[in-house]
């Protein structure tokens, strides 16, 4: 058994990531555009989406996903989608955003803190990546920069549980 090593950051402590060859995903849900200043409003998007979880036509599994895409650096902004995996897009509500996540290699980080500390974990990951010897996978407008996976162990009431951050990397 390999011992887990902790990597310290001023923002958050990270466990060493595991590496996965992720399958292609179709994600559908609600999305909005955010900036560094407005990203603190993402929980309101989740509150709007929460009643749909388990009720989306064609939903696959019980996990929910937070997908970051269309990132711009000047000025910093990004689209964020709160959604679920679906088998196809044909029956999802018209107000839902749809995004295809390609099959690719990922560095997968566990987030064990309260969900409100996820921005600190993301900042720590983005500081860790350039020093890791890994390179982020190329991305386009509709290709996710990363996604958060909220598994069955995530508790919506407490904001704690099964949360992972999946960062696409070059294989």
Whereabouts are the PLM-identified features?
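A solvent-exposed interaction/effector surface
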Residues: 1-171
């Amino acid at each position: 058994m390999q011992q887990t090593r902790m990597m310290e950051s001023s923002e958050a402590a990270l466990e060493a990531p595991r590496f996965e060859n992720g399958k292609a995903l179709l994600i559908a849900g609600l999305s909005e555009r955010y900036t560094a200043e407005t990203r603190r409003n993402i929980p309101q998007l989740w509150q709007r989406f929460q009643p749909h979880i388990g009720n989306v036509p064609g939903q696959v599994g019980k996990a929910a996903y937070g997908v970051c895409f269309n990132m711009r650096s000047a000025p910093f902004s990004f689209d964020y989608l709160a959604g679920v995996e679906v088998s196809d897009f044909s029956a999802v509500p018209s107000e839902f955003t749809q995004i295809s996540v390609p099959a690719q290699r990922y560095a997968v980080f566990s987030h064990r803190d309260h969900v409100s500390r996820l921005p600190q974990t993301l900042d720590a990951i983005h500081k860790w990546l350039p020093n890791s010897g890994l390179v982020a996978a190329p991305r386009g407008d509709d290709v996710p920069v990363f996604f958060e996976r909220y598994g069955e162990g995530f508790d919506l009431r407490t904001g704690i549980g099964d949360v992972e951050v999946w960062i696409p990397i070059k294989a």
